[in-house]
Amino acid sequence: FMLMFCVSGILLNHRSLIKEVNVSRKYLPSRYEFRNWNGGLLRGTLDIGKDLMVDSMRNVDSCRQLLLYGNGGIWLTDSKASYFKDFNEGLPEGADYRQIKNVIRLDNGRIFAVSPFGLYRYGVHNKWHEVNMSLEDEEKFTDIASHGDTLVVLSRSFVYTSLPPYKTFKRIQLHAPKDYDGKVTAFRTVWLLHSGELFGITGKIVVDAIAIILVVLCITGIVFWLRPKRKALLQTSLHLHDRIGRYTIILALLIALTGWCLRPPVMIALVLSKIPSIPGTTLRSKNPWNDKLRIIRYDESCHDWLLSSSEGFYSLNIKNATVKVITSVPP
């Protein structure tokens, strides 16, 4: 298990490098299999009427066309669910690329879809085309919405707006709300410390090195436990295990302790606790909304935007980039 934890931890620490690598679900436990649209396979639907009827569907007698989207990409069906057709042509291959967060249709009929790694527009040759956007390193999209002819794309840290023909985007950094105190949850602090991301790429590399050290300790420990007949191999493994373990025990304990804290019951206490962000770390950001934005929708009744974040719900005035906390929300 330790070997598996170390290797998987290194890979997850550099997710962008392995996002094109896929593993068939048939090699995973049964709870990871898609059955009856479970596991986030169906996140939402979009009614597109009959305007988007593709050639292969011309003879299908159905009421309206629907797009279904989720962790498996996008699918075309009708209001009777009488068929399901793959609607992913043009999207990059790979499970990460096809985690579709939202699909919308603008008033002018144009259709956009967003995944954590890209924004796509449906158009020429009846397929998806990626929309080029300038993003910060490691920045990921979370949602997309529209009002009138204004397209709004939400990332984990910024709001992007665009007008026809939707080729250029304006990045908006939202102002801090009145109740902003700069504190972060203890859970997030421990999470970033465990991965090393708390100290940027340098911290990640250090944690990767610790994981490699743990791999060496596991291998040398297994060799010593097996007691090979070759005394030279036994002595070498014991020497390495002892020397490396002595010098790295503090770092190894740090990784083990922070990993243990990320699971219940300690995790619950950390989630409910807030502490000041540590100076000199990635948590101390000039952007008060760094890695906090999740969902955005236009509120027709209030004529503003409804913003969901890891800190709660807010009403948003995009023009002024100001937010106001909404207190009357479900617990």
Language model regions located:
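Juxtamembrane interface at the cytosolic side of transmembrane helices
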Residues: 1, 201-257, 262-264
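Repeated scaffold domains used in trafficking and secretory/extracellular systems
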Residues: 36-60, 93-108, 137-149, 286-298, ...
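Conserved beta-propeller blade signature
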Residues: 65-68, 75, 110-112, 150-152, ...
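Extended, hydrophilic extramembrane loops/domains of integral membrane proteins
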Residues: 151-189
